Regions:
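Hydrophobic beta-strand-centered segment that forms part of the acyl-chain substrate-binding groove
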Residues: 7-8, 71-108
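Catalytic strand-loop segment that frames the active site of acyl-thioester-processing enzymes
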Residues: 22-57
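N-terminal leader/capping segments at the start of a protein or of a new domain
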Residues: 1-36
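HotDog/MaoC-like acyl-thioester-processing domains
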Residues: 2-4, 71, 102-103, 112-145
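Conserved positions in beta-strands of structured domains
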Residues: 28-31, 98, 112-114
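Hydrophobic core residues within well-ordered beta-strands of beta-rich domains
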Residues: 24-26, 107-108, 121
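A conserved, well-ordered hydrophobic junction motif at loop->secondary-structure transitions
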Residues: 43-77
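Terminal leader/tail segments of proteins
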Residues: 41, 47, 100-110, 135
């Protein structure tokens, strides 16, 4: 596999970096990546399973945040020519949702890795639409063994 230039807007490529599969994929672009940080994106499609009355629901936004962390891990594994691992949300320490995105809005989510140890990743997450912060969270994700 060759290293790709960022941003990566190929939805199929991005989907292959995470364990989730359609219709449960909540990230569709990898915008930036560096040590301990990633910015992922999602343009909310009308047919998304978490859309109700043209609004992307809380559960979808939380899953988007978690999949942004999974994308960080998956891209790390891609760079090492390894298959991405399966993981899950271990805990959510805090989450604050200011507003929910609408269909066709572009969510940009920045993940800052605070700590990684034995498959557990502690992160701060900020989700924005048009530079407006719509949600923040601190969560732990765990790689399944």
């Amino acid at each position: 596999m060759e290293k790709l230039l960022l941003p990566i807007l190929d939805k199929t490529f991005v989907e292959n970096l995470i364990p989730q599969k359609a219709p449960f994929v909540m990230v569709d672009k990898l915008l930036a990546f560096c040590e301990n940080e990633i910015t992922a994106g999602l343009t909310v499609p009308e047919e998304n399973i978490f859309v109700s009355e043209n609004i992307f629901q809380e559960s979808g936004l939380v899953e988007h945040m978690a999949q942004s962390v999974a994308l960080y891990t998956g891209y790390q594994y891609f760079l090492k020519n390894e298959m991405p691992p399966t993981g899950y949300i271990g805990s959510i320490k805090s989450i604050k949702i200011e507003r929910l995105p609408k269909i066709d809005e572009n969510i940009e989510t920045s993940v800052s890795v605070l700590q990684e140890f034995m498959g557990v990743t502690l992160v701060d997450i900020i989700s924005k639409v048009n530079e407006e912060i719509i949600a923040t969270s601190q969560m732990k994700t765990v790689i399944a063994s």
